[in-house]
Amino acid sequence: MLNKNDIVEVEIVDLTHEGSGVAKVDGFVFFVDNALPGEVIRMRVLKLKKNIGFGKVDEYVTLSPSRNQDINATYLRSGIADFGHMTYTEQLKFKRKQVVDNLYKTAGISDVEVAETLGMKTPYAYRNKAQVPVRRVKGQLETGFYRKNSHDLIPIEDFLIQDKEIDKLIVFVRDLLRRYDLKPYDEKEQTGLIRHLVVRRGHYSGQMMLVFVTTKPKVFRIDQVIAKITEAFPSIVSIIQNINDKNTNAIFGKEFRTLYGQDTITDSMLGNDYEISAQSFYQVNTEMAEKLYQIAIDFSDLNSDSIVIDAYSGIGTIGLSFAKQVREVYGVEVIETAVEDAKKNAERNGITNAHYVADSAENAMAKWSQDGIKPDVIIVDPPRKGLTESFIKASVAMQPEKITYVSCNPATMARDIKRYQELGYELKKVQPVDLFPQTHHIECVGLLTRVER
């Protein structure tokens, strides 16, 4: 009979989709962080439930050849890089396996080509955005990342997967906050001033934005702080204050104030320029997002007569990237500010054949159908929860030749593809793309074509 704090020798037989090792002992399935298949470990029992348990590695008996032994354990503890203990080659294989397994288990698909995961040459320092909590640790203001499954801050200076200029700026600002005695937020007591630092940097432009998230509007000696920052970092074109006085896990409150420079930064993707605000959705890995979108374009096999619906269009990054190659693009997005941004981005890039509406995709498609619009391709890029049944039915009712599915969750993609197959579409091919190296997240593009009946 197992008890808490027992130490048992186990072999890791599998990995969960989030990268925890799986071991089986005495009728329990145990989940163990930082353990890989094939490894034998001495495991300390942390928690027991009815037939599952949680353990931690007390000692490694046998190491996997797939282990990256150079990773700093801080990155694993914080969740910054929950796959960092795997070699990058192994990460790419595992991510492809996730896609293959989900398609088979959920949709019964085993005969469709799933390509090798497209990875990065240098799978570090890729994030163009950082959201960093500011807290007091051991009596001192610190910036860092939360310990996994907690709100305990681990102080970190090198975030491994963030742009190095962003890391430098965060450390510089942290030191200024200490010097000017600006108080960090205390979540339990609901006191303090500085909650988060949010930084964005244009991959191509190099322009930087810094956002101070504060509990109150007034920040003592903020002008002096800004002068020091802009002197040290000439690439900063925007400093914003966001006021969040609520007891919430949400980073931003409703009010934004521009303290210095512009409201936005500018960057480019696939040849188009985009204005990016503090709250804009913009892919955090520009290099791999360009590859992801190019694959979606290639799968869609577009030409100058193509009419394309861009569902979940955001600020227009997918639709505008191919708008000049096709006849018309119709984009729909539920967030009104994103739609306004998409319209501005179309105008900025001299694109006149892209039309954006703020609505649910189902409603927009029903209206477009009534107006006689017949798309050749519908490109979908839904959130992690995937597509709704009403969306799937509305998209099928428009009878496009192709549906190109850009997914950030292989489980919901497989579920949705199963439904599309029941409604007369067939999955032709899938390309996984690694937008988030060192983490468990995986994106992929799937091509569905209409079956002639």
Residue ranges of model-derived segments:
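Short, conserved phosphate/pyrophosphate- and ester-handling motifs at nucleotide-, phospho-/glycolipid
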Residues: 38, 162, 285
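Rossmann-like S-adenosyl-L-methionine
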Residues: 2-5, 9, 17, 217, ...
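Short, acidic/hydrophobic/Gly-rich beta-strand patch recurrent on exposed beta strands
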Residues: 21-26, 144-147, 211-213, 342
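Extended interfacial segments that mediate partner engagement and assembly in macromolecular machines
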Residues: 61-71, 75-184, 204
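Carbohydrate-binding surface patches
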Residues: 198-202, 208-218
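Terminal RNA-binding accessory module
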Residues: 1-74, 107, 355
